[in-house]
Amino acid sequence: MKVNRITLWSVDLTSHETYYMAEGKTCDTVKTHVLCLDTDSGLKGWGEVCPIPHYLPAFADGVPSAITEMAPAIIGGSQFGVDAPMRKLDGVLQGHLHAKSVVDMALWDLFGKASGQALYTLLGGRTRADMPLY
């Protein structure tokens, strides 16, 4: 299974109301990025990242440039598994974890689909019967 196309959508998400954060910061619109990795086998892997630059050490408008920089290392490579492709990307572009995270999610999605297993199984399996939230 090899990735033969990368598509990235950038979308502004506007809240119905202003969101109030710590330190008096507010946010009413954030930019999110949705990535699709198409493969020669017909499978698609999806990822999404929504960096909020005034809250996190990330720059949303830098994601498309980072994906363009990393694309040659992604397209054409065997993508069965996640660790080796992500290590390869570290050699192409240092840092930029927010931009790499969208690729990481899409690779995990592909890995799960290709292996026919749920993502939680690939990440170590179910460890509890239920999960209390609060």
Regions found by a protein language model. Give the residues of each.
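Broad gene-expression machinery/nucleic-acid interaction feature
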Residues: 32-34, 102, 130-132
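Metal- or metallocofactor-binding catalytic centers and their adjacent structured scaffolds
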Residues: 5, 38-114
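N-terminal amphipathic alpha-helix/helix-capping segment at the start of soluble metabolic enzymes
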Residues: 1-13, 87-91, 113, 117-130
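Short capping/connector residues at structural and topological boundaries
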Residues: 16, 24, 79, 124-128
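Hydrophobic faces of well-ordered beta-strands that scaffold small-molecule active sites
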Residues: 45-47, 129-134
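Generic marker of residues within folded, mature protein domains
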Residues: 25-27, 93, 123
